[in-house]
Regions:
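Short amphipathic alpha-helical segments with heptad-repeat character
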Residues: 33, 37, 41, 85, ...
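Charged, amphipathic alpha-helical coiled-coil/dimerization segments
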Residues: 2-11, 15-21, 96-156
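Exposed, interaction-prone assembly regions rather than primary DNA-binding/catalytic cores
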Residues: 152-177
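N-terminal leader segment of winged-helix/HTH proteins
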Residues: 1-55
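Base-recognition residues in the alpha-helical recognition helix of bacterial helix-turn-helix
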Residues: 34, 63-66, 92-94
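Residues within helix-turn-helix
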Residues: 77-78, 89, 96, 116
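N-terminal helix-turn-helix DNA-binding core of bacterial DNA-binding proteins
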Residues: 41, 45-87, 101, 173-177
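Short helix-coil-helix linker/hinge
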Residues: 55-61, 90, 121, 144-147
Length: 177
């Protein structure tokens, strides 16, 4: 066990990034939090890099298009802001960029002339479908070290954490995640 390469890698990981902040005397939950944060940051940075290199697009634009892809009837810009957890100004800027590139369209909301409904255009749908397929391959690749049972167990454990957080946090905090 002493020469197990996975233990060497874990010891090395303890000294990287967020995890370097945790000392041996720190509570196990703090070390877990820092490992989750470090892992998430690594994955997010890699996805950002690949989206930029492969498609010339930011993660923010990808996430925006993903929300619209799920909403076949489009979304109000205020709904996009809430779902993406960004300001209305950020959504307006992204909408302007994506509309200029022909990836989204906006039209006045029938029930509220002050609101805009944003939808993916046919070009936007095709572009997002290609990106989403690549994105899924990347995520599968990044998690290739986990077998199906490990993925299911981690998914379940993180689901338990999410439920706990939703119950513990104030409604306004829980709704934004």
């Amino acid at each position: 066990m002493k020469n197990d390469p996975s233990h060497t890698v874990l010891r090395e990981a303890d000294g990287l990034g967020h995890e370097a902040r945790a000392g041996r005397g720190d509570h196990a939950v703090l070390r877990l939090w820092l490992r989750l944060l470090a892992s998430t940051t690594q994955i997010e940075n890699e996805v950002r890099r690949r989206l930029r290199e492969r498609f010339g697009i930011s993660l923010a634009r990808f996430d925006y298009m993903a929300q619209l892809d799920r909403a076949k009837d489009g979304l109000k810009m205020s709904e996009l802001s809430r779902l993406l957890m960004v300001t209305g100004g950020n959504v307006t800027g992204l909408t302007d960029e994506l509309a200029r590139d022909g990836l989204v369209s906006r039209e006045a909301s029938p029930g509220d002339r002050r609101a805009w409904i944003v939808r993916l255009t046919p070009k936007g749908k095709a572009t997002f479908a290609a990106m989403a397929d690549e994105h899924e391959r990347w995520i599968r690749e990044l998690f290739a070290g986990f077998d199906a049972d490990a993925v299911a167990a981690l998914h379940s454990q993180l689901g338990t954490l999410r439920v706990h957080l939703l119950e513990k946090l104030k409604p306004s905090e829980a709704e934004t995640t």
